[in-house]
Structure formats: structure tokens, C-alpha cells
Curated annotation (Swiss-Prot):
CDD domains assigned to the protein according to its UniProt record, in alphabetical order: ASKHA_NBD_actin
Protein name from the UniProt record: Actin-97
Signal peptide: none
UniProt main location, coarse: cytoplasm
A GO molecular function held by the record: hydrolase activity
This protein's GO CC annotations: actin cytoskeleton; cytoplasm
Localisation: Cytoplasm, Cytoskeleton
Pfam families per UniProt: Actin (PF00022)
Described purpose of this protein according to its UniProt entry: Actins are highly conserved proteins that are involved in various types of cell motility and are ubiquitously expressed in all eukaryotic cells. Essential component of cell cytoskeleton; plays an important role in cytoplasmic streaming, cell shape determination, cell division, organelle movement and extension growth.
Amino acid sequence: MADGEDIQPLVCDNGTGMVKAGFAGDDAPRAVFPSIVGRPRHSGVMVGMGQKDAYVGDEAQSKRGILTLKYPIEHGIVSNWDDMEKIWHHTFYNELRVAPEEHPVLLTEAPLNPKANREKMTQIMFETFNTPAMYVAIQAVLSLYASGRTTGIVLDSGDGVSHTVPIYEGYALPHAILRLDLAGRDLTDSLMKILTERGYSFTTSAEREIVRDVKEKLAYIALDYEQELETSKTSSSVEKSYELPDGQVITIGAERFRCPEVLFQPSMIGMEAAGIHETTYNSIMKCDVDIRKDLYGNIVLSGGTTMFPGIADRMSKEITALAPSSMKIKVVAPPERKYSVWIGGSILASLSTFQQMWIAKAEYDESGPSIVHRKCF
């Protein structure tokens, strides 16, 4: 490991919606593409096109009309290993253009990822891609590192799942981790529904992408939802217009804050679950009473679904209402939080002290996939 200074480790953060990949030491991922694999619906429709049996990422997205699309990662956890292998292959060879047998690879995993899954990831890296070394790190822990902390509670909310993960001195506390199956994709679906009620038609998966863009560009979180609703009825101050790809212009008003309000009130889309504020509070309450103060003072937001303007103030307000009155609450929303898992991985993999933490190929050959539980925790 220590012989070549030029051997940059690779960092690959596999999300439900997007893969973020790049080189350790960089400040942002080089490649960000959708976690999708598409296969042709009919063989031979594209005669002379040199048709492939599978397309990955952006190419699958652009050819979606003739493909059946699959998302190999569901709710943050890999559910289809053949397709996952295709995504990693695409990441190394087409996006980063590297030979994986020449670089250590740091992969990320969802909190509470089943043991068999970590073993499978390890096995694929060493046996299919022949990596010299690899490591698996928990996503939320990397986000906390990226914010310069080792203790705190991370609310990580992406496209497929949200988690609250209390971390003390660098270690996640598994008994207090809570999962909420409410994330970006649900908000996009909810906005599609709201816009359909208003007479706009968004049904296909291609149109879902348009709605996702509307959500990302225009949605925000109200500090006081009821008051914002009242304001929107009498004033046009919240109205914004959005031009669709075909030139049609739609106007959206209260939908801008109604859509992400679901994060705080999941009952709005018929979900019986606590909102993100209450889930965070419940997670803190599952921790030892002595560390709660440190958690309340270091609530770190991470993931694309925490990018809504107004989210930090609202979180702070809601948690202050739940916590003991003397407690100091601090919600941290780093501007780069969309990629903070990847950034944390980049930081970790480039630390000199981390170099002895890698699982080397020799160790894997000796112990098999279960080595991952001894070396990555």
C-alpha cells in the first residue's frame, strides 16, 4: 500500500438515486450519474446501432424510451447485485477511466446495512474487480467527518431513504439509528400528484425527471406552514413560473412549500411515520443521557433532500419545541451537503492514519468476505 504515492484511492458513494464517484483528496466527485441500468425492451429495434445488452446511468436515462429501467439500489440498500456490478463497472471504466486493480476503493453503505450485503460488496470488489484494497464506511459517519466533527447526530436524507444516525467519537450507535422510508423520490411523486390535481399532466418516468427539476429549483420549507398557506392565499409573493422543455410555462405557488412539508408531516401523503424532526429527537432519546447534550448541539444535515431553503431554521424550531427548555440546539447545514458523504470519504481515504485500516487483498484471500466485519465498523 505504501509503495506508490501516485496510487490515488477511489471513493464511490452509491445512492438510491445517484452514484457519486471520484478520487480521494479531491474536493468534489468527478462523476455523478443516476443509479440506473436499462435493458432493451425489444431485441434488434436499433439495427446497425451496435446495440448493447445494458446501458448505465445517463445513457440509460437518455435512451429510456426503448429500455426497461431498473434501480438496483432500493431505500439505500443494494437489492440487485448483477446490476450493481454493471454500475461499478461503468463507474471505473467509463466514468473515472481507471483500472480498479490499481487503486484501493472506498465504498459507502447505508446505516444498518445487512451483514450479508457488506460481504457481497467486499467479494465483488476483490473477486470481480481485483482491487488491491478496499473499505466500507457508513454514509452518515462520512458526512459527519466532512463537517469536521466526530460526535453529533446526522440526518441523512437522499432519494430513497432517510436515516438519523447518532455518532459518538467516530462510531455510529446502532441501537439508536432510525430509518424513515420517506425521501426525495416520495417528494417528487407528491409534487407530481399536486401538479396533476392542478390540471398539468405528468405521468411518465421522463416527466418525473421534469418534476424533480421543478422541486429542486423552486421548492422551499416554510418556517410556519399554516401561516405560509394563509399568505399564499392572499398574495402572489410565493408564485414562480417554470418553463417546461416544450416551451409551456407553468406557475407554481403554494406547491413550492406544500411539497417538502411532507418531511415534517408524513401524514400529508398518508404515511404513518414521525417527521424528520421527531425522528431526530427520538434517535437522540435512544442514546445515553450523558451524550444527548453533544448530539443536540451538533445536528448535521446531509444528502440532497436536505437542500431545501429554510430546512435548518425549521428543524431548529421543531427540535427546540421537543427538547428540554434549557438545551442548546444547533442545526448545521453545510452548503456542500448534497455531496458530503462523498467528501467525507475523500477526506477519510486520504488520511495517513487511515492507510492501515484498508482491507488488503491478501487479508481477504486468507479470511474471506467476513473480514469486512472485523475491519470496517
